[in-house]
């Protein structure tokens, strides 16, 4: 039984491509160094060269459609969301630039900002558990290149769109999905655009506002920074901020989503303004967020907590770029190949997150065992981390492969040879 059947996920690829997809996902359950970021070979029945060639053929195969590759991710998202106890699902949206400055063989790179910032731009949406903030599955992937924007829901590249139009289009698509729970779309300050937010009719959103952004409060236009000084905040608890304890203060007010430059606008919607402030024990301000949201049926502390959890997508980008997969060092030479491998890597993340979020007695025993195998030193306050789980999973998969393919006599012989070099403890 492959991992798709094991997890009740559909895969519409042909049997041979489905088998290779399964193998590639397992091959990506590891933490790769920069200089060895290629597809690893877990099977002892196949040489590394043969495995690399098979991976190349898969990633370069036009029959491997993005929609087909993404189907298991979408089904995993529905399953994990349905299993959560909350009536909400959080969707964090963000962009991530992947720089390939030294990859001259990638002829379809684009300039993303300055002349040395060339590569492919990823736009991703990450589904989070509304009770815990833990990641569940990607709920949309776009990769922008010279040919256009490759999307996990389209067979061909699409015409590129400005960021906010791309965001609105993504949200409208997600709202059409049969997820059966209310989605809360969480976006950073880039989404602080009143016209675009007003465009999201019937959609629940939460965004961070810029300090100089103006809203209408008590029939007057005022910046969020000045309004925050007027709002009475109350301490709501102690949270972790950059490894240290901080006091969380939360206050809120009702405002009209209308800018000072839009004085002639009528029927602008009323939204909530939430100011979230972190202070140390001396009362010194460590951080402050000005939040705007049209979610009415949760308290201000919940909104502040939900925005705090938006950081999960940043953590995922770190896994993709540095702490796990080294995407900026991948040697595939075209955006379609990079995009296919990105979807494969995302599926590996989904399985790792599923294990991380599993609180069953069996999973609670397995996770510390995998951390031990990883050789990682983790914080006492957070003994289990996603990168450490990935590293431990790879060692465990290699162990099971050894036990399945070598006899006890062979293993004892190898131990004896090793002991002659490294001592009897081997």
Predicted regions: what is each one?
Residues 1-106, 114-121, 126-426:
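Single, function-defining residue in the core of a domain
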């Amino acid at each position: 039984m492959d991992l798709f059947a094991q997890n009740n996920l559909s895969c519409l690829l042909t049997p041979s491509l489905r088998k290779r997809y399964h193998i590639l996902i397992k091959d990506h359950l590891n933490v790769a160094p920069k200089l060895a970021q290629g597809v690893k070979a877990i099977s002892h029945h196949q040489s590394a060269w043969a495995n690399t060639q098979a991976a190349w053929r898969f990633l370069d195969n036009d029959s491997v459609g993005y929609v087909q590759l993404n189907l298991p991710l979408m089904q995993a998202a529905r399953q994990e969301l349905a299993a959560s106890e909350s009536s909400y699902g959080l969707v964090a949206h963000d962009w991530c630039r992947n720089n390939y400055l030294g990859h001259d063989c990638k002829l379809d790179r684009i300039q993303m900002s300055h002349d040395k910032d060339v590569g492919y731009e990823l736009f991703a949406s990450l589904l989070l558990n509304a009770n815990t903030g833990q990641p569940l599955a990607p709920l949309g992937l776009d990769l922008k290149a010279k040919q256009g924007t490759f999307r996990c829901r389209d067979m061909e590249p699409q015409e590129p769109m400005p960021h906010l139009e791309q965001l609105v289009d993504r949200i409208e698509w997600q709202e059409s999905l049969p997820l059966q729970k209310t989605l809360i779309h969480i976006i950073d300050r880039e989404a602080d655009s009143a016209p675009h937010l007003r465009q999201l009719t019937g959609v629940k959103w939460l965004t961070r506002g810029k300090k100089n952004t103006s809203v209408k409060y008590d029939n007057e236009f005022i910046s969020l920074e000045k309004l925050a000084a007027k709002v009475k905040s109350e301490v709501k608890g102690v949270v972790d901020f950059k490894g240290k304890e901080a006091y969380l203060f939360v206050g809120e007010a009702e405002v009209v989503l209308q800018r000072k430059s839009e004085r002639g606008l009528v029927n602008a919607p009323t939204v909530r303004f939430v100011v979230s402030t972190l202070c140390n024990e001396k009362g010194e301000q460590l951080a402050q967020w000005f939040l705007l949201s049209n979610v009415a049926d949760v308290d201000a502390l919940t909104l502040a907590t939900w925005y705090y959890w938006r950081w999960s997508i940043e953590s995922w980008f770190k896994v993709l770029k540095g702490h796990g997969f080294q995407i900026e060092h991948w040697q595939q030479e075209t955006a379609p190949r990079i995009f296919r491998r990105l979807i494969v890597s995302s599926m590996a993340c989904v399985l790792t997150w599923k294990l991380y979020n599993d609180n069953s007695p069996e999973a609670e025993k397995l996770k510390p065992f995998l951390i031990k195998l990883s050789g990682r030193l983790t914080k006492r306050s957070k003994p289990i981390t996603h990168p450490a789980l990935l590293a431990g999973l790879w060692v465990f998969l290699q162990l099971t492969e050894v036990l399945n393919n070598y006899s006890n006599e062979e293993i004892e012989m190898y131990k004896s040879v090793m002991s002659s070099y490294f001592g009897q403890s081997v």
